[in-house]
């Protein structure tokens, strides 16, 4: 599933032939690691495809995301309405931006040429359990696409009772 795309400008000083960056999620690779609502952990394989005159490759990565539905947007709205019947939209936005309830770790698996030949296998470097902020659209959308593939609903639609 195409999760993100960015087309490079042809008139750019760095890139003169266009191209772009495309991020794909292998929805068949999504695995449930933990199911203990409101806590969830999923892992999946995703690909970052770079196409330009200076970089043409496919990077394969494994992503593990920990979800805490106590911080889903629907839960934040519900709890905000319970505490204050007319919450300020600004307070709600600040709360949603400060904690998304998502944490990730990623591992580089392999790098391929555009025709699928193995280019190199990077040393396995894991990132620590880093927060995914809603402003980080690429990683947030990737985490949400994983949740959608596993549970057929968006993470931010989950309401914790």
Model-assigned labels for residue ranges:
Residues 1-62, 67-161:
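N-terminal secretory-pathway/extracellular module detecting exported/lumenal segments
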């Amino acid at each position: 599933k195409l999760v993100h795309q960015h087309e490079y400008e042809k008139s750019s000083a760095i890139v003169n032939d266009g191209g772009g960056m495309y991020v794909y999620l292998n929805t068949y690779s999504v695995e449930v690691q933990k199911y203990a609502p409101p806590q969830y952990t999923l892992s999946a394989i995703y690909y970052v495809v770079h196409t330009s005159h200076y970089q043409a490759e496919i990077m394969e990565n494994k992503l593990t995301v920990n979800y805490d539905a106590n911080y889903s947007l629907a839960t934040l709205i519900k709890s905000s309405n319970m505490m204050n019947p007319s919450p300020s939209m600004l307070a709600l936005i600040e709360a949603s931006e400060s904690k998304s309830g998502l944490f990730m770790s990623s591992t580089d698996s392999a790098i391929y040429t555009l025709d699928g030949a193995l280019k190199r296998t990077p040393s396995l470097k894991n990132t620590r359990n880093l927060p995914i902020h809603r402003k980080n659209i690429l990683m947030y959308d990737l985490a949400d696409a994983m949740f959608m593939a596993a549970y057929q609903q968006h993470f931010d639609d989950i309401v914790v009772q």
